[in-house]
Amino acid sequence: MNDEASKQLTDARFKRLVGVQRTTFEEILAVLKTAYQLKHAKGGRKPKLSLEDLLMATLQYVREYRTYEQIAADFGIHESNLIRRSQWVEVTLVQSGVTISRTPLSSEDTVMIDATEVKINRPKKELANHSGKKKFHAMKAQAIVTSQGRIVSLDITVNYCHDMKLFKMSRRNIGQAGKILSDSGYQGLMKIYPQVQTPRKSSKLKPLTAEDKACNHALSKERSKIENIFAKVKTFKMFSTIYRNHRKRFGLRMNLIAGIINHELGF
């Protein structure tokens, strides 16, 4: 679907097919036009694909995760041309500020921390990426989200590791937040930040009481915001299916999508 065909769609259908709101698409397009004019101030050959169609093709790639060859055929250009120009779009948008903005936390903020996995093909050195628990190879992304839904930070590891180890490697300072909510993967976090709340664990000798179960249920309900954010990220099939590309661009792409989600939520 090119830009001309998308103009016939309703706003709701545009969002479902492209992955972003129409107003967001127009704002991103304005950023690209400014960057393109600066890059080609001295003129040059006119590209076969307009900026509107280039942005549409780039978003379709992340949203649908078809191959570049298939999308390039739809737009009537060569695969290598689309790859090169799509990568320019990704880098330009991130450098122009379409990413997660660094906003300091305050004592009034409640933040949630969690990690999600993205499957990858079996690598040559498979043990570094193997999840022994879930029996597949994966990369991990850790998000810190406020109770309003703003993504504060996003950290990526291309080698599979425990949630707490990823947090320590990220060196994120969230001590300014008034309350920190996490799942059982961050049991040691309360030794660093006393305001951390994690689920209460049971054992054979000490099963959970009714009060413990109620507290865990309330915590899970309060933490649902970060699960909703991960669901928004994974509407883009690049992050919900097996990631086929080079892993070095994975963090850039996920930060770009996280920045777009923040923007559409008003942050």
Residue ranges of each PLM-predicted region?
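Charged, often Cys/His-bearing segments associated with DNA-binding zinc-finger transcription factors
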Residues: 1-43, 188
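Short helix-loop boundary/capping segments at the starts of domains
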Residues: 34-38, 63-67, 91, 95
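Active-site-flanking structural segment that lines cofactor/substrate pockets
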Residues: 39-53
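Short, charged beta->alpha transition segments
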Residues: 44-45, 58, 99, 140
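Short, amphipathic alpha-helical "recognition" segments used to contact nucleic acids or chromatin
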Residues: 50-64
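Short, well-ordered secondary-structure "scaffold" segments embedded in the functional core
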Residues: 51, 68-267
